[in-house]
Amino acid sequence: MDITVNSQSNTVAPKQAECKKMRYSIRKVATVGATSALVGTLAFLGATQVKADQVTETAPAVATATATPETSTASLTVASETATSVATSEAVESSVAHSEVATKPVTETQPSNTTPSVVEEKASSTVVTSSSDATTPSATVAAVSAPAHTSEAAVEAPTSTASSEAADTHTEVDLKVSENSAANANLSKLNGRIKSIVEENMTSDQIVALTEEEIKALNKVDFSDDAIKGTGTSLTYRNLKDIVASFLKQDSKLAVPYFKADTIINMPAFNTVDAQTMKKEEIDVWDSWPVQDAKSGVVSNWNGYQLVISMAGAPNKNSNHIYLLYRKYGDNDFTHWKNAGPIFGYNALEDDQQWSGSATVNSDGSIQLYYTKNDTSGGKLNWQQLASATLNLAVENDEVVIKSVENDHILFGGDNYHYQSYPKFMSTFDDDHNHDGNPDRTDNYCLRDPHIIEDNGSRYLIFESNTGDENYQGEKQIYKWSNYGGDDAFNLKSFLNIVNNKHLYNLASWANGSIGILKLDDNEKNPSVAELYTPLVTSHMVTDEVERPSVVKMGGKYYLFTASRINKSTDAEGTVAAREAVGDDVVMLGFVSDSLRGKYRPLNGSGVVLTASVPADWRTSTYSYYAVPVEGSSDTLLVTSYMTNRGGIAGAENKSTWAPSFLIKMNADDTTEVLPKMTNQGDWIWDKSSESLVHVGDQNSAKLPNEDFNVDYYAVSGYGLKPHTYPTVDGSTGVSEAHGVLTVTVKDGKDKKADKPETPVSPTEGNHSVDDKTNKPGTSKPADNNQPSADKEDKPTNPTNPDSPARTPFPYYGDHSNDNNSSNDHHVAVPVKPSTGDSVGDRRPVAQAAEIATPVPKTIVATGPTVPTNTVKEESVTETEAPKPVKSEEKVQSHGVDKANEVTKSDESSKGNNTKVAAKLATTPKTPSDSEGSNSNILSILATIFAAIASLALLGYGLVTGKIHLPKK
C-alpha cells in the first residue's frame, strides 16, 4: 500500500471569512503538534526504509524503478524527500566487466560497507511497476516528473512484515529475471554461430552492455573456411600477440646475441665515392645479399671470390643505390672487403633508386641480378617494381670490375588479381575506412625484395607484396574470423577491441601484406614472368610489411624467412611493451613447408625466429636479417644483418655497417634456437675458420659508454617522416584517448640527447603511411656533419646511368631511402636491465606472455544477482594489460577504470541540473547498520525535536499575544 503525506494538510485551520481576528483554540494547536509529530515519526520510519546514496540539487521528488530492454539497463533510484533534505553521498565501488558498470542490490545479507554503483538517470514520467505477492514487500515505485519548485514527495512505506529471508529471495529472483531478460534481448538479436560464441564467452553483464553497433558488427562476422582462396598461410592476429609475448620473454633461443660494441668498426670498403653525391666519404650500408647458387642457396664461389651486393648511400642525402662488394672466397677478414663501385654507375638520380633483391650465377658465368626499382619522380609514393639485369664482370689485376650491365628491365609491377599494383593502391589511397569523413591515407604499398630460388629445374622469385582482388584488403578482412587465429574467446575479444577503435579499425582494414611467388621463363639473362601464384603467406589485418623474404631448401624442407617490425603491425600495445622492455621491436619470422608452394607452418608456433636484444639507437642494434645455408649442413643457417641504424643514430661517427654473423639451428619439431657461435663482421660463409670470439658481448658491453636506454624512436623508426594517423596522447596520463593504451614516456637521466624535451610518444610512433613513403627504415635529418674527404676522389671506370631528365625531388621518402628531414626528437626511456653476465644465452625474462596476450574472460558464475546500469559504453576492449609507465608519478588510465568516478565527476561539473538524481531503494525494512544508521537516526530525531519545538513555539506565541485563550472552567 502506498502512503502519501501532504505536509501542508491539516496544518493550518481554515480561514473564517466572517471573523476579523484569527483565533486559535488549544484543540487546533494540539492538531498542529500532532501533525508535526507525525511528520517526525514518518521521517524516522522512512530512515529505516530509504537510504540515499547520492542526492543532487533537485527540488522535485522522484522515486523510480526502471527496466528498459532498449538500453539494456535496470536500475533503482529514489530522490530526497524535499529540496531541503540533506544527505551525505557515500563512496562508490564499481566492478567493470566487458565495459559496463554492474550494480548489486543491497540486502540484509550484504555487508554494510557494500554500496552500489551510481548511474545518471533522466527524469521520467513513465510509471514502471513490479508486482509482488501480498506476503512480500512491494517493489513498486513511481517515476514522477515535477517542476523544480514542487515540494511534494512520493514515499513508499512497508506493506508487510514478512521475513527478511523471503524478501531477499524474492528480490534476487526479480533482479535475476530482469538481468536475464536484458541479456536474452541482446542475444535474440544475434544470428547463428556468433550467438553461441557470445553466450559461451561473455558474462550476462557483458552481453547486456553490447551496443547496437557491436551487435550489428557481430552479425557481420564471416565464418568461411580457414582455407580461403588467395590466402596462403595466414599470419594471424593470434600469431602477432604470441610473437610479442615471445619478444618480451627475451628467450635466449630467440634473442639476437649481444655483440661487444667497442669492437665494431665502420666498413672500410664503404669509405668511397657516393654514386649520387659524387663525394668520397664514409657512407652507410644496409640491406645486403650474396651472389648465391639458386639451387642450394650457398654462397657462390665466382672465380675464387665471394660477391655481395649492398644498398648504401651517404648519410642524410636520400642516396639509395646498390654496390658490388668482393673478397677472396673463404677470407674472414672484414677489412679485406673491396668495393667495385655502384652497379648502375655514378651521377645517379635521387628519384631513380635501387632497393633490395638477390643474385645468382648464370650458366655463362655472368651474374643475374634481381632487384627493386623504385621511382619517386613527380611526387610518386614509392612506385616499386621487380626488375632484373645481367652483370658482366671480370677480374683484372686481382680486382673484380663491372664491365657492363645489360638487359635491365622491369619484370613485374603487380597484376591486381594476385598482387596489388601501384595504380590500384593509389586508386583507394584516399578512401575513408573508419568513416570519420577524412581520407585515411594510411595504406602502405609494398612490391619489392625479389629472392631467386631454383626448384625442379625452374627459377622462381619470392618477393614482398600486398594482396590483390583474389583476397583484397578492406573492412571485410576485420570480419573474417580466420584472420584472428585464436579460440573463440580470443577472437571475440580481439574483434570487439578493433571494431570499437576507429584507429585500429583503420589500420586493420588496410593491412594486406603478403609473400608472393612467381615463376620465370627459361631465359636466364633476359627473363620474364611465366606464371603467377597465390601468395605463400598473407598477413591480412595484421601488417602490410613482411620484408626481405627468402626461401632456403635444406634437409628436405623449405624454410621461408622474413624481417618485420612490430610497430608496423596493428598491435599498438605490443609496440609499447616491446619498446619499454627492450628499446626496439624488430623481429625475424620463419615458416616451414614440405614443398616450395606447399602449406607453410609458422616456426616456434607463432612464426618468431629472432627478437631484438638492445635499444634501436645503440651501436650494436641490428636489422634486415638474411639467412644463408651452411654448406654440408641439413639444419644450420648463418644469419647476417647490418648493424647500427642509419643517419648517425648512434653518433655521426658510427656508420651503418655489416654486423657479425651467428648460427641458428632448425629442429625437427619446427622449433629453432640461436647457437653460441659467432663470426667476424661481414662473414657470409661458415666453415671451420669462421668462428670468432672477438665480438661476443653481454648486455653491458653491447653499448658504448655514451649510450643509455633513452631511445629516439622518431629518428630511429620515423626517419623524419610522419607517423600513421593515431589518436592524440594525453600528456598528463600518457594514455591514448582513443584506445586507452599506455604510451612510453621519457625517463629522467643523462644521455647524449638529454638536452631535448621530454615528450610522450604515441604507441605506434614509427608506423608510417605510404603518404609518408614509409617502407623501410630511414632517419631524421640533422645537419649534415659529413664533409667530403680530403682524399683524392677517384671514380672507378664503371658504367653510368643512361641520360635522364632532371627531376624535382619529392619531400617524402621511403624506409629504403636515406633522407633525413629534421624533426623534433621524441625520446623513450627503456628500463635498465641488470647485467646477465657474459653468456649469450643467459637472459632474464622481461615480461610474461600473459601480460601481452590476455584471453577473453570466461563466463563468471555470479554469487548474487546484479543489476546492469545504463552507462556509457567503453570505446574498446583492451586486449592486453598496458605496461607500467616509466615515470612513477604519471597516472595510467586502463580499460578497467571505474566508470562510477566518471559519473560523479560529471555530476560535479553539471551542478544546477535539477533533473538528475541517483539513489537506491532497499526492498526490505532493516535496522540501519553502523555505517548508514547514524545519519538516518540523527535525521529522524532532529525531525521529531523540530516538531515538538514548533508546537511549543506556536503555543507560547499564542498565549503571549492573546491569540490563544485557555478555556475557562
From Swiss-Prot:
One of its GO terms (cellular component) is plasma membrane. GO terms for molecular function: levansucrase activity; metal ion binding. Pfam families: Glyco_hydro_68 (PF02435), YSIRK_signal (PF04650). It comes from the Bacteria. CDD domains: GH68. Its main location: membrane. SUPFAM superfamilies: Arabinanase/levansucrase/invertase. The keyword Cytoplasm does not apply. The chain crosses the membrane at residues 938-958. Belongs to the glycosyl hydrolase 68 family. NCBIfam families: YSIRK_signal. This is Levansucrase. It comes from Streptococcus salivarius.
